């Protein structure tokens, strides 16, 4: 199922990404642009996973551990999460044969979970 981030990502990023089941494994530095696009569309990046792409599979390398509680301000929640997502990616930059999966949610997707 396509989520809101998938809907707003440009085809150019999707074309360079590896599709693993229903998730895009986005290469560096495209992942930084994807986080920026998420921010512009008020989509919170709740977590980042780094994978090595091996053959037709993925090998988990690292994952983010930041976590914020949602208060009354969705925009602040998005900013807090996405700044941490960007910092995590910048501190865990990987080259070829690697990519990132962004776990994300828009306000209405989050509300649907409740």
Model-derived regions, located:
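Alpha-helix boundary/N-cap detector
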Residues: 22-29, 69-72, 76-83
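Short, well-structured hydrophobic secondary-structure segments
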Residues: 27-56
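Acidic, low-complexity, intrinsically disordered interaction modules
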Residues: 52-79
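Long, contiguous N-terminal structural blocks used for assembly/anchoring
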Residues: 1-25
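Short, solvent-exposed polar/charged micro-motifs at secondary-structure junctions
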Residues: 28-33, 55-62, 108-114
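Amphipathic alpha-helical binding modules
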Residues: 79-114
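N-terminal targeting/docking segments
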Residues: 14, 21, 46-51, 95-99
């Amino acid at each position: 199922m396509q989520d809101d981030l998938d809907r707003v990502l440009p085809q150019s990023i999707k074309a360079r990404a590896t599709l693993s089941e229903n998730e895009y494994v986005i290469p560096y530095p495209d992942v930084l642009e994807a986080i920026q696009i998420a921010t512009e569309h008020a989509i919170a990046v709740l977590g980042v996973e780094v994978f090595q792409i091996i053959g037709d599979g993925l090998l988990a390398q690292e994952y983010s551990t930041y976590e914020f509680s949602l208060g009354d301000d969705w925009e602040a929640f998005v900013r807090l999460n996405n700044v941490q997502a960007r910092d995590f990616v910048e501190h865990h930059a990987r080259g070829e044969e690697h990519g990132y999966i962004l776990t994300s949610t828009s306000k209405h997707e989050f509300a649907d979970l409740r």
